[in-house]
């Protein structure tokens, strides 16, 4: 079984998907982290961001695997480093690159196929999982929250990692990101017509997970 969770940036997809997978005994596939990993490697290798092909070469060469909810690049656990503000700022160079998108989608499908072949169901999250990557998924969820709620969560998330970011600037970035994600030609943010729409404002993570478990089990 494949469960897709799509939604805008800062909606809590990663946290919810991880906990939903744990609650159901499924494997978790963090597709967003895969694009972040490409950007992370680009920063580490001082790539010229004005040359898209340079980043494509990195994406082609890097070995990505997902294990127990963690993301590894060339056997290095990068699950935490890829969440930094610096990586967040550069991730769009990977996510908006058609060639990199094609590489990552292919790898996501391969990972899902391998896990399903072993009898393991997965929870996968991103921007277009239920539309472009896994259009035939058995259960699709669109998870969202207001921009203000998402900005507050993002500021708190960075604070917990010892990083300080401005709320107003974060809110502006989220609004810009939403518009950009919906308008981009490659992998645009789009709610699957057959997805269950869930707004999480005012809800705890536990409440959201409980609601999604109920949706999956119905």
Locations of the language-model features?
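N-terminal phosphate/diphosphate-binding loop that engages ATP/GTP or pyrophosphate donors
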Residues: 22-85
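Anionic, Ser/Thr-rich low-complexity intrinsically disordered regions
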Residues: 126-135, 141-152, 161-186, 206-207, ...
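NTP-dependent small-molecule kinase module
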Residues: 73, 77-81, 89, 155-163, ...
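Hydrophobic positions on the alpha1 helix immediately C-terminal to the Walker A/P-loop
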Residues: 16
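Hydrophobic anchor at the beta1->P-loop junction of P-loop NTPases
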Residues: 3-5
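Conserved lysine of the Walker
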Residues: 13
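The conserved Walker
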Residues: 9
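ATP-dependent NMP and nucleoside kinases share a basic, alpha-helical "lid"
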Residues: 79-82, 86-160
């Amino acid at each position: 079984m494949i469960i897709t969770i799509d939604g805008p940036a800062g909606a809590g997809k990663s946290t919810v998907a991880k906990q939903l997978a744990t609650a159901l005994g499924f494997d978790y596939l963090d597709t967003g982290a895969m694009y972040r990993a490409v950007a992370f490697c680009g920063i580490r290798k001082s790539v010229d961001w004005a040359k898209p092909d340079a980043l494509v070469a990195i994406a082609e060469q890097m070995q990505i695997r997902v294990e127990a909810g963690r993301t590894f690049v060339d056997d290095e656990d990068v699950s935490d480093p890829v969440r930094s503000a610096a990586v967040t700022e550069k991730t769009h160079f990977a996510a908006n690159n058609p060639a990199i998108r094609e590489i990552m989608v292919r790898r996501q499908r391969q990972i899902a196929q391998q896990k399903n072949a072993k009898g393991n169901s997965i929870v996968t999250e991103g921007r277009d999982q239920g539309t472009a990557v896994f259009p035939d998924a058995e259960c699709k969820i669109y998870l969202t929250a207001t921009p203000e709620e998402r900005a507050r969560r993002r500021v708190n998330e960075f604070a917990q990692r010892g990083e300080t970011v401005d709320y107003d600037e974060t809110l502006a970035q989220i609004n810009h990101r939403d518009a950009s994600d919906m308008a981009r030609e490659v992998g645009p943010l789009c709610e699957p017509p057959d997805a269950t729409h869930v707004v999480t404002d005012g809800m705890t993570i536990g409440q959201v997970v409980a609601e999604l478990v109920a949706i999956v089990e119905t």
